[in-house]
Amino acid sequence: MLIILTGLPSVGKSTFSKAFSKKMAEKNIDNIILGTDLIRESFPVWKESYEEFIRDSNNYLIKEALENKFSVIVDDTNYYNSKRRDLMNIAKECDTNYVTIYLKAPLNLLLKRNIERGQKIPNEVIKNMYEKFDTPGTKYAWDLPDITVDTTEKIDYNEILNEILEINENKNLKIEEDKIPKSEPVESDLVKIDSLTRNIVGNLIKTGKIDKKDIKLLSEIRKSFLKDCKKIESEKLDFEKIEKDFLDYLNKNLK
């Protein structure tokens, strides 16, 4: 079974996944927590050039775990419905069920929690992600979450596990082809560019190369760059050039 978590930074995904994993183990359900951040944090330094390897490695580990009959908890933001769709398709490829869990909390609480844990991610980035977040089920019926968890309230892990086991028993595994769409190349490329530029910005802030007072401006510059990228034809996209162009664009507009 593939358990897909989705939710913004500081909503409590890691806390939830660890507690839920332990609860599954108590019921003798072999499981593992996987996610891109777990791989990303294994590097001594971050480089944008690592991102494709990180994504591919995470997908490979998920597939291997599912094929070896482990239940997998995916601890990632999965803030775009396309990311959730790709995970659903992995479950389908591995002939296993998936369950989506949407963890939510108000923006003001997310920002407060982020400050309390040392602002690993700048609050301005979380605000930007909050604005762009594809709330599960608001666009497509296939994206409706199986379970929604309000992390401002006490979480009953036993109840959630029982609900998941029931869903797993009753859910039709052989989903028809048209229920979960395949990735559209243009959309997929734009998601990659969004992720690429977001990681570059996050790294610049984390390493202190950008002054905190410029974070809001940096976010606006990134948005402007992404708008320009939408005009590029998919077959003409060169991600190495886009990375260089984005850094040049930042240098030019931050002066």
UniProtKB/Swiss-Prot annotation:
<keyword id="KW-0067">ATP-binding</keyword>
<comment type="pathway">
    <text>Aminoacyl-tRNA biosynthesis; selenocysteinyl-tRNA(Sec) biosynthesis; selenocysteinyl-tRNA(Sec) from L-seryl-tRNA(Sec) (archaeal/eukaryal route): step 1/2.</text>
</comment>
<dbReference type="InterPro" id="IPR013641">
    <property type="entry name" value="KTI12/PSTK"/>
</dbReference>
<dbReference type="InterPro" id="IPR027417">
    <property type="entry name" value="P-loop_NTPase"/>
</dbReference>
<dbReference type="GO" id="GO:0001717">
    <property type="term" value="P:conversion of seryl-tRNAsec to selenocys-tRNAsec"/>
</dbReference>
<comment type="similarity">
    <text>Belongs to the L-seryl-tRNA(Sec) kinase family.</text>
</comment>
<comment type="function">
    <text>Specifically phosphorylates seryl-tRNA(Sec) to O-phosphoseryl-tRNA(Sec), an activated intermediate for selenocysteine biosynthesis.</text>
</comment>
<protein>
    <recommendedName>
        <fullName>L-seryl-tRNA(Sec) kinase</fullName>
        <ecNumber>2.7.1.164</ecNumber>
    </recommendedName>
</protein>
<dbReference type="InterPro" id="IPR020024">
    <property type="entry name" value="L-seryl-tRNA_Sec_kinase_arc"/>
</dbReference>
<dbReference type="GO" id="GO:0005524">
    <property type="term" value="F:ATP binding"/>
</dbReference>
<dbReference type="GO" id="GO:0043915">
    <property type="term" value="F:L-seryl-tRNA(Sec) kinase activity"/>
</dbReference>
<feature type="binding site">
    <location>
        <begin position="7"/>
        <end position="14"/>
    </location>
    <ligand>
        <name>ATP</name>
    </ligand>
</feature>
<keyword id="KW-0418">Kinase</keyword>
<dbReference type="Pfam" id="PF08433">
    <property type="entry name" value="KTI12"/>
</dbReference>
<keyword id="KW-0808">Transferase</keyword>
<keyword id="KW-0547">Nucleotide-binding</keyword>
